[in-house]
């Protein structure tokens, strides 16, 4: 579907969509291999409406693989595509679900974490960065994309790196620990240091270093904290 068609077809839905006012949108943020997908699956098993990253769309065009193999060529293209597909995923989720929605990352981490990091490194040049900022800001405002809270799965870069190697996605073969350190610093600046950007939302920080797959007590504690966090968003 073309961009104009997506905007027009969803604008009328947004005008009467009570989800935007009565239900909460929460994103799970964290580094590569922080444990987000695992947490998303646990939440899904416990009855939450969850929305996973559109990873297969990125793989379908081989963009994720191209990004890691030749970032100076593909960084801007990938981040533009990621922002677009995540926007569509967000809109589809609002139209399909009648309750709180938990997203695996958001358009905001696309911008404040990944696109910013790639610009800092120099893989996205200043011209591309200005274009990215202009259209991402416009699209976010036009589509009224909002999140009401963030669950920050804070996992140390060393642990993330070990998990990344263990899961052995071929696209990530060239990812170095230095890049994970940079992404960790970006998350800390965004989520742990007073959320300095243009929107401020409550943040629940969860330590992602430990085991919450086989440790049932820890899993129960995390689920309880998330339940309380979402409940407090309504107060």
Curated annotation (Swiss-Prot):
InterPro entries: DCK/DGK, Deoxyribonucleoside_kinase, DNK_dom, P-loop_NTPase. ATP binds at residues 30-38. It is an enzyme of class 2 (transferase). Pfam families: dNK. The active site is at 104 (proton acceptor). The keyword Transport does not apply. It comes from the Viruses. Its EC number is 2.7.1.74. One of its GO terms (molecular function) is deoxycytidine kinase activity. The keyword Nucleus does not apply. It catalyses: 2'-deoxycytidine + a ribonucleoside 5'-triphosphate = dCMP + a ribonucleoside 5'-diphosphate + H(+). Substrate binds at residues 53, 68, 79, 105, 110, 172. Keywords: ATP-binding, Kinase, Nucleotide-binding, Transferase. Belongs to the DCK/DGK family. PANTHER family: DEOXYADENOSINE KINASE (PTHR10513:SF35), DEOXYNUCLEOSIDE KINASE (PTHR10513). This is Probable deoxycytidine kinase FPV151. It comes from Fowlpox virus (strain NVSL) (FPV).
